[in-house]
């Protein structure tokens, strides 16, 4: 009996302790000073950039020619991105195009700043963004990602090699980005 009372007391104490936190999350519609009221309607739409064709309008052949990797397979192809892998396997070089609609480029840049050797501003054909370089001790600069902002959207090309020799990854990423910008509508 004593155990049951103690358990009940602990449960009630826990609920009492959690009540202020849960109550703070309620949508009571209270407009008292200090309450946060959104300045725009919840259903307001963002400003979208141009339309990008599948794979950024870049062909499998172009990716193969620029990367100089034979046997590339487009293993993921949909309306917002594509991924090319050597022989279709996860080991080895990989290349990808991604189109982020209504997503902040700043969050992606921050992730890059935390995980890459360097991240710099870039402008390609009048469009601003970032270029991130990743390196491996045995390979040097083997990864390059270019993200370019378009209103509330952004695109990103990622080029990553896994063994030498390979062409400069940032030259490839910049050229693929240029082609995608040219193919946008």
Curated annotation (Swiss-Prot):
Lipid addition (N-palmitoyl cysteine) is recorded at 25
Per UniProt, subcellular location reads as:
Cell membrane
Q: Which domain of life is it from?
A: Bacteria
> Which InterPro entries does the record associate with it?
DUF3558
| Signal peptide range in chain numbering | 1-24
Q: Which of UniProt's keywords are assigned here?
A: Cell membrane, Lipoprotein, Membrane, Palmitate, Signal
Quote the gene name from the UniProt entry.
Answer: lprB
Q: Tell me how this protein sits in the membrane.
A: Lipid-anchor
Instruction: Report the protein name in the record.
Output: Putative lipoprotein LprB
Q: Tell me which GO cellular component terms the UniProt record holds.
A: plasma membrane
Q: Where is the lipid attached (S-diacylglycerol cysteine)?
A: 25
